[in-house]
Protein backbone atom coordinates (compact mmCIF):
# COMPACT_ATOMS: atom_id res chain seq x y z
CA UNK A 1 0.00 0.00 0.00
CA UNK A 2 1.32 3.45 -0.92
CA UNK A 3 2.38 5.68 1.92
CA UNK A 4 0.39 8.90 2.22
CA UNK A 5 2.49 12.00 1.58
CA UNK A 6 2.83 14.34 4.54
CA UNK A 7 2.22 17.93 3.68
CA UNK A 8 4.95 20.37 4.62
CA UNK A 9 3.38 23.27 6.48
CA UNK A 10 4.36 26.57 4.94
CA UNK A 11 5.94 29.13 7.25
CA UNK A 12 3.30 31.64 8.26
CA UNK A 13 4.04 35.31 7.73
CA UNK A 14 4.21 37.05 11.08
CA UNK A 15 3.75 40.80 11.20
CA UNK A 16 6.49 42.05 13.52
CA UNK A 17 7.66 45.65 13.20
CA UNK A 18 10.72 45.70 15.48
CA UNK A 19 13.17 43.20 16.91
CA UNK A 20 16.66 42.46 18.20
CA UNK A 21 19.58 41.28 16.06
CA UNK A 22 22.15 39.21 17.94
CA UNK A 23 25.51 39.24 16.12
CA UNK A 24 27.83 36.59 17.59
CA UNK A 25 31.25 36.99 16.03
CA UNK A 26 33.90 34.46 17.04
CA UNK A 27 37.41 34.02 15.66
CA UNK A 28 36.16 31.20 13.39
CA UNK A 29 32.60 32.12 12.38
CA UNK A 30 29.89 34.79 12.54
CA UNK A 31 26.30 33.95 13.50
CA UNK A 32 23.38 36.38 13.20
CA UNK A 33 20.01 35.72 14.85
CA UNK A 34 17.11 38.14 14.51
CA UNK A 35 14.45 37.79 17.21
CA UNK A 36 11.28 39.60 18.23
CA UNK A 37 10.92 41.58 21.47
CA UNK A 38 10.04 38.44 23.46
CA UNK A 39 13.19 36.64 22.26
CA UNK A 40 11.59 34.23 19.77
CA UNK A 41 13.94 33.71 16.81
CA UNK A 42 12.49 34.98 13.52
CA UNK A 43 15.46 34.29 11.24
CA UNK A 44 19.08 33.28 11.56
CA UNK A 45 22.11 32.78 9.38
CA UNK A 46 25.82 32.14 9.67
CA UNK A 47 28.91 32.34 7.51
CA UNK A 48 29.04 28.54 7.35
CA UNK A 49 25.42 28.38 6.21
CA UNK A 50 26.25 30.73 3.33
CA UNK A 51 28.69 28.16 1.94
CA UNK A 52 31.99 29.44 3.33
CA UNK A 53 34.31 26.78 4.70
CA UNK A 54 37.38 26.82 6.91
CA UNK A 55 39.22 30.09 7.40
CA UNK A 56 36.95 31.92 4.92
CA UNK A 57 34.11 31.77 7.46
CA UNK A 58 35.95 34.26 9.68
CA UNK A 59 36.20 37.00 7.03
CA UNK A 60 34.18 40.23 7.14
CA UNK A 61 32.71 39.44 3.71
CA UNK A 62 31.26 36.15 4.98
CA UNK A 63 29.71 38.02 7.92
CA UNK A 64 28.23 40.57 5.51
CA UNK A 65 26.63 37.84 3.40
CA UNK A 66 25.21 36.11 6.48
CA UNK A 67 23.76 39.38 7.82
CA UNK A 68 22.12 40.17 4.48
CA UNK A 69 20.58 36.69 4.36
CA UNK A 70 19.18 36.90 7.90
CA UNK A 71 17.95 40.44 7.25
CA UNK A 72 16.05 39.51 4.09
CA UNK A 73 14.37 36.60 5.87
CA UNK A 74 13.31 38.91 8.73
CA UNK A 75 12.00 41.55 6.32
CA UNK A 76 9.61 38.96 4.88
CA UNK A 77 7.93 38.98 8.30
CA UNK A 78 7.50 42.76 8.17
CA UNK A 79 10.40 43.79 10.40
CA UNK A 80 11.67 47.35 9.92
CA UNK A 81 13.53 48.52 13.05
CA UNK A 82 16.29 46.70 14.92
CA UNK A 83 18.30 46.86 18.10
CA UNK A 84 21.70 45.26 17.52
CA UNK A 85 23.57 43.30 20.20
CA UNK A 86 27.16 42.53 19.19
CA UNK A 87 29.02 39.78 21.03
CA UNK A 88 32.50 38.39 20.58
CA UNK A 89 35.96 39.44 19.37
CA UNK A 90 35.67 38.38 15.71
CA UNK A 91 36.39 40.33 12.53
CA UNK A 92 32.80 40.28 11.24
CA UNK A 93 31.22 42.61 13.79
CA UNK A 94 31.23 45.92 11.91
CA UNK A 95 30.57 44.45 8.47
CA UNK A 96 27.53 42.54 9.75
CA UNK A 97 26.18 45.75 11.28
CA UNK A 98 26.68 47.68 8.04
CA UNK A 99 25.05 44.89 6.05
CA UNK A 100 21.95 44.99 8.27
CA UNK A 101 21.69 48.73 7.65
CA UNK A 102 22.15 48.31 3.89
CA UNK A 103 19.30 45.76 3.70
CA UNK A 104 16.96 48.54 4.86
CA UNK A 105 16.67 48.27 8.64
CA UNK A 106 16.69 51.33 10.87
CA UNK A 107 19.07 50.52 13.72
CA UNK A 108 17.92 52.19 16.93
CA UNK A 109 20.57 51.01 19.41
CA UNK A 110 23.88 49.17 19.21
CA UNK A 111 24.93 47.26 22.32
CA UNK A 112 28.22 45.43 22.92
CA UNK A 113 27.48 42.47 25.18
CA UNK A 114 30.87 40.74 24.91
CA UNK A 115 31.58 38.95 28.20
CA UNK A 116 34.74 40.30 29.85
CA UNK A 117 36.37 38.06 32.48
CA UNK A 118 37.46 39.54 35.79
CA UNK A 119 40.46 37.17 35.82
CA UNK A 120 38.39 34.05 35.21
CA UNK A 121 39.58 31.12 33.09
CA UNK A 122 43.13 30.79 31.87
CA UNK A 123 43.35 31.90 28.21
CA UNK A 124 44.63 29.55 25.49
CA UNK A 125 48.41 29.44 25.01
CA UNK A 126 50.08 31.65 22.38
CA UNK A 127 50.43 30.21 18.89
CA UNK A 128 53.96 29.58 17.64
CA UNK A 129 53.87 29.58 13.86
UniProtKB/Swiss-Prot annotation:
Domain of life: Bacteria
Pfam families: Ribosomal_S11
GO molecular function, one term: structural constituent of ribosome
InterPro entries: Ribosomal_uS11 (IPR001971), Ribosomal_uS11_bac-type (IPR019981), Ribosomal_uS11_CS (IPR018102), Ribosomal_uS11_sf (IPR036967)
One GO process term, biological-process aspect: translation
Gene3D superfamilies listed in its UniProt record: Ribosomal protein S11
Keywords noted in UniProt: Ribonucleoprotein, Ribosomal protein, RNA-binding, rRNA-binding
UniProt key word RNA-binding: yes
Record-level GO cellular component terms: ribonucleoprotein complex; ribosome
PANTHER family: 40S RIBOSOMAL PROTEIN S14/30S RIBOSOMAL PROTEIN S11
Self-association and partners: Part of the 30S ribosomal subunit. Interacts with proteins S7 and S18. Binds to IF-3.
Family membership: Belongs to the universal ribosomal protein uS11 family.
Function: Located on the platform of the 30S subunit, it bridges several disparate RNA helices of the 16S rRNA. Forms part of the Shine-Dalgarno cleft in the 70S ribosome.
Name this polypeptide is given: Small ribosomal subunit protein uS11
Taxonomic lineage from the root: Bacteria, Pseudomonadati, Pseudomonadota, Alphaproteobacteria, Hyphomicrobiales
Amino acid sequence: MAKEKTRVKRKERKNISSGVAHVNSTFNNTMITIADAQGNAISWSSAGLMGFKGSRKSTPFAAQMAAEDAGKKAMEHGMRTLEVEVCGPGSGRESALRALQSVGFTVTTIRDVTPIPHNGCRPPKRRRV
